[in-house]
Amino acid sequence: RSLRIRSAEEADAKNICDLFARTHEQTDYLLAYPEENSYTVEQEAAFLKKLLESDRDVMLLSEVDGDLCGCASVCVVGAKYKIRHRAEFGISVDKSFWGLGIGTKLTQTAIDCAKTAGYRQLELDVVADNNRALRMYEHAGFQEFGRNPMGFQSKASGDQTLVYMRLEL
């Protein structure tokens, strides 16, 4: 099997929307439920166009043998001077591709992109029960800096604690 990681393009909009629906149905650890994705393909394409025009933000896609199986993003926390050195990191991988190291490779590529873009800190939050993700982030060098015991409210399990993590670049 062949893994390819590349930047998303406008033409990827439909496949990204489909991936979002799939991955958000497969786990309760992501921010939204599939039905909460209100982006149309056209809106996703416009969002991707804006990302492509940015010199600092990026959405990465992972493909195995040409099939889209994951995505990761690095986006500025805010444009104000005091916070523009910080970027947010998000990632999701189709469950049928878990355990193949794709998340690790996407994460490392995102870290490299964040460094190249001049960010000084990469941040994320992760559900405390998501042990696989926590291990991956810790292995990549992220460190916990706080917790929110009511960070997510899950339909299935009620309150979920969020772990806040950061990586100095």
Predicted regions span which residues?
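Conserved G/P- and acidic residue-centered "switch" motifs that form tight phosphate/ATP-binding loops
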Residues: D12, G66, G101
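Conserved GNAT acetyl-CoA-binding A-motif
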Residues: T107, A114-D125
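Terminal substrate-recognition subdomain of acyl/acetyltransferases
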Residues: R1, D159-L169
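Helix-loop element at the rim of GNAT/NAT acetyltransferase active sites that forms part
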Residues: D18-E35
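Conserved active-site alpha-helix within GNAT-family acetyltransferase domains
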Residues: L100, T104, T116, D129-G146
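Conserved catalytic-core motifs of GNAT/GCN5-like acyltransferases
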Residues: E123-V126, E138, Q143-Q160
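A short beta-loop-alpha structural element at the N-terminal edge
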Residues: L3-D18
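Acetyl-CoA-dependent GNAT
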Residues: N37-S96, T107-T109, C113, E168-L169
